[in-house]
UniProtKB/Swiss-Prot annotation:
Protein known as: Protein transport protein Sec23A
Bilayer topology: Peripheral membrane protein
Lineage start: Eukaryota, Metazoa, Chordata, Craniata, Vertebrata
Cell location: Cytoplasmic vesicle, COPII-coated vesicle membrane; Endoplasmic reticulum membrane; Cytoplasm, Cytosol
Keyword Protein transport recorded: yes
Keyword Protein transport listed: yes
PANTHER family: PROTEIN TRANSPORT PROTEIN SEC23 (PTHR11141), PROTEIN TRANSPORT PROTEIN SEC23A (PTHR11141:SF7)
One example GO MF annotation: zinc ion binding
A GO cellular component entry from the record: cytosol
Taxonomic superkingdom: Eukaryota
UniProt function note: Component of the coat protein complex II (COPII) which promotes the formation of transport vesicles from the endoplasmic reticulum (ER). The coat has two main functions, the physical deformation of the endoplasmic reticulum membrane into vesicles and the selection of cargo molecules for their transport to the Golgi complex.
Domain notes: The Gelsolin-like repeat mediates interaction with proteins containing PPP motifs.
Gelsolin-like repeats: from-to residues: 632-718
């Protein structure tokens, strides 16, 4: 008999789905009392090397309001060649190609191990990939040179049929013609003027191709008139390499005390307009590289006077950031247009100051694009991160997909409240859409323009079954996730995942429901909800909401005597949940203190799309200890773990930090590692470096690497993350285990838990 933990892990490995509850309360009333909603973390394109795509199309339910896909939960009559849909109970005839099926000869989609299955759509043209580079030239020469080298590297990784285009901008915006032999030719636009898609189309002499007008992507065989600006790599490889080589810093002079005039908003608008009228509904990627904030035209985020700093959180709270609303509105409109056409917008921002990611965040967030933030294009952090965008799988195809749509179907006791992640609503109403919206709701279909094997959405459901209509014993609820997308090979594919979970009466089987709680998934699902609210609500209000939910969960599932905090006990399935909430409250996703608006936008962007494992690391970083006392071991994220004779390795997802304890640091300064008789010390110093490198090699975006020691200025990154169990207030306690006291007024986990227990058991609550 597998345990719930094994069941949860097997389901995640097979289907890329983790539910907050794995047994569902059978009535609306009981479900609301569970505090944490029935919800799922879904990784639609989770890598399954053991799941080859099937070279035929899915069989659909014939009822027009259902159209669910044939799956292992359907009942099949092999003699009559009929199948009953498990969502609407419609009886359907199998198509003629299934004439040979029998109980001994079943198609893959009816086998339980294929609860997730991928189909290749045979009809329709195969589309080339499209990459449009949008490059800021207002930057230092070394930065521009490094960026040009990275772009040339990326060109060498593109398939020969991929179409590429180039737009450069500074004070003016240049759209480069790529079909000209031996001559550089570009269309120049003023950067301080906003243009509609129609105006851009007319100025560039682009007429919509007939295929584009029908809403279908143009076919590869008949390139549309846009081929002056978007050309196959194989035709213009040399031309484009030469053109990039000749790119110079923006020639307009920058007076003393001024910022360069940078037209980022106009450039992005032209890029969106160009793709919109030439390749609608086709996988395309706008890759925008910026070295500073937009200082003129639509989407400007700061004036050109250097003495006026770019907005801070303090300015925004005091309503003293005059460009924020207008700029955000401009970028939101562009994000909406790009998403409607199925195009992805990436933003690679490298500068020492803020560049306007707060205002631009909707572009990558709504289109499934990447957001990368660094200090300079001339760092390994940017170069390696950018190279990882073009990672390939075993078949040498990019691990990126385009033009995804996710459709969800549910059995009649469930409705869909909404989704949170890098998606936009397709406004598809249906019988399974709930009126109570969570995140992007009011629909059962979402568009995910850019999607990779780690892209993860949080989907929230509502149990709608009435209290007085019990579900028969052994009844199961089902959900089907249907993801259609353009594979990087050009094929259209459909990934179908169908799952079922048992219903239980919460009045008689509350233990079964409690035992099915997945505290890791629930913590991340509630965290996504909190971060989503933090985008529009006041910080303290979000923390209060989070605390209230935690107290209610403790009251519902804790064991205690009224008004006796000491008696409070949580079962194993809930025991880690309060600690996740403690670290979430202190995280940069909810605390903006000490972070710029751009940094907060960057952190939240990654949190809203990563899978469960990476999200947990972001909420509660992992700490490993290395010492002479034994092999490396995970230790508590606590100040008591900081000991003089230890090396610590901390992984926060965004940073990899190596910290040498006081004694270790002194030995290193004395040079013991260079003496042959202390070779074991040299190995000890090297071990965390090797482990850190392993993480650095595989993660996207590449983390910042921090090497520090006791008393070092960078040690603050570690001290701000650990639970301050020892502070300057209690460091002289009697008989305490030695650890590093932390100078903070933050509450420790112990105080937090004591307070939580007190509130949970209070009869006044």
């Amino acid at each position: 008999m597998t345990t719930f933990l094994e069941f949860i892990q097997q389901n995640e490995d097979r289907d890329g789905v983790r539910f907050s509850w794995n047994v569902w309360p059978s009535s609306r009333l009981e479900a609301t009392r569970m505090v944490v909603p029935v919800a799922a973390l879904l990784t639609p394109l989770k890598e399954r090397p053991d799941l080859p795509p099937i070279q035929y199309e899915p069989v659909l339910c014939s009822r027009t309001t259902c159209r669910a896909v044939l799956n292992p939960l359907c009942q099949v009559d092999y003699r009559a060649k009929l199948w009953a849909c498990n969502f609407c109970y419609q009886r359907n005839q199998f198509p003629p190609t299934y004439a040979g099926i029998s109980e001994m000869n079943q198609p893959a989609e009816l086998l339980p191990q294929f609860s997730s299955i991928e189909y290749v759509v045979q009809r329709g043209p195969q589309m080339p990939l499209i990459f449009l580079y949008v490059v800021d030239t207002c930057m230092e020469d070394e930065d521009l040179q490094a960026l040009k080298e990275s772009m040339q590297m990326s060109l060498s990784l593109l398939p020969p049929t991929a179409l590429v285009g180039l737009i450069t901008f500074g004070r003016m915006v240049h759209v480069h013609e790529l079909g000209c032999e031996g001559i550089s030719k570009s269309y120049v636009f003023r950067g301080n003027k906003d243009l509609t898609g129609k105006q851009i189309q007319e100025m560039l002499s682009l007429t919509k191709s007939p295929a584009a007008q029908q809403g279908r992507g143009p076919q590869v065989q008949q390139p549309p008139p846009s081929n002056r600006f978007l050309q196959p790599v194989q035709n213009i490889d040399m031309n484009l390499t030469d053109l990039l080589g000749e790119l110079q810093r923006d020639p307009w002079p920058v007076p003393q005390g001024k910022r360069p005039l940078r037209s980022s908003g106009a450039a992005l608008s032209i890029a969106v307009g160009l793709l919109e009228c030439t390749f609608p509904n086709t996988g395309a990627r706008i890759m925008m590289f910026i070295g500073g904030p937009a200082t003129q035209g639509p989407g400007m985020v700061v004036g050109d006077e250097l003495k006026t700093p770019i907005r801070s959180w303090h300015d925004i709270e005091k309503d003293n950031a005059k460009y924020v609303k207008k700029a955000t509105k401009h970028y939101e409109a562009l994000a909406h247009r790009a998403a409607a056409s199925g195009h992805v917008i990436d933003i690679y921002a490298c500068a020492l100051d803020q560049t306007g990611l707060l205002e631009m965040k909707c572009c990558p967030n709504n289109t499934g694009g990447y957001m990368v933030m660094g200090d300079s294009f001339n760092t390994s952090l940017f170069k390696q991160t950018f190279q990882r965008v073009f990672t390939k799988d075993a078949q040498s195809n990019f691990k990126m997909a385009f033009g995804g749509t996710l459709e969800i179907k549910t059995s009649r006791e469930l409705k869909i409240s909404g989704a949170i992640g890098p998606c936009v609503s397709l406004n598809a109403k249906g019988p399974c859409v709930s009126e109570n919206e969570i995140g992007t709701g009011g629909t059962c279909q979402w568009k995910i323009c850019g999607i990779n094997p780690f892209t993860t959405l949080a989907v929230y459901f509502e149990v709608v079954n009435q209290h007085n209509a019990p579900i028969p014993q052994g009844g199961r609820g089902a959900i089907q996730f249907v993801t259609q997308y353009q594979h990087s090979s050009g094929q259209r594919r459909i990934r179908v995942t169908t799952i079922a979970r048992n219903w239980a009466d919460a009045q008689t089987q509350i233990q079964n429901i409690a035992a099915s709680f997945d505290q890791e998934a629930a913590a991340i699902l509630m965290a996504r909800l909190a971060v989503y609210r933090a985008e529009t609500e006041e910080g303290p209000d979000v923390l209060r909401w989070l605390d209230r939910q935690l107290i209610r969960l403790c009251q519902k599932f804790g064991e205690y005597h009224k008004d006796d905090p000491v008696s409070f006990k949580f079962s194993e399935t809930f025991s880690l949940y309060p600690q996740f909430m403690f670290h979430l409250r202190r995280s940069p996703f909810l605390q903006v203190f000490n972070n710029s608006p751009d940094e907060s936008s960057y952190y939240r962007h990654h949190f809203m799309r990563q899978d469960l494992t990476q999200s947990l690391i972001m909420v509660q970083p992992i700490l490993y200890a290395y010492s002479f006392n034994g092999p490396p071991e995970p230790v508590l994220l606590d100040s008591s773990s900081i000991l003089p004779d230890r090396i610590l390795l901390m992984d926060t997802f965004f940073q990899i930090l190596i910290y040498l304890g006081e004694t270790i640091a002194q030995w290193k300064k004395a040079g013991y590692q260079d003496m042959p008789e202390y070779e074991n010390f040299r190995h000890l110093l090297q071990a965390p470096v090797d482990d850190g490198q392993e993480i650095l090699q595989s993660r996207f975006p590449m983390p910042r690497y921090i090497d520090t020691e006791h008393g070092g200025s960078q040690a603050r990154f570690l001290l701000s993350k650990v639970n301050p169990s020892q502070t300057h207030n209690n460091m002289y306690g009697w008989g305490q285990e030695s650890g590093a006291p932390i100078l903070t007024d933050d509450v420790s986990l112990q105080v937090f838990m004591d307070h939580l227990k007190k509130l949970a058991v209070s009869s006044a609550a």
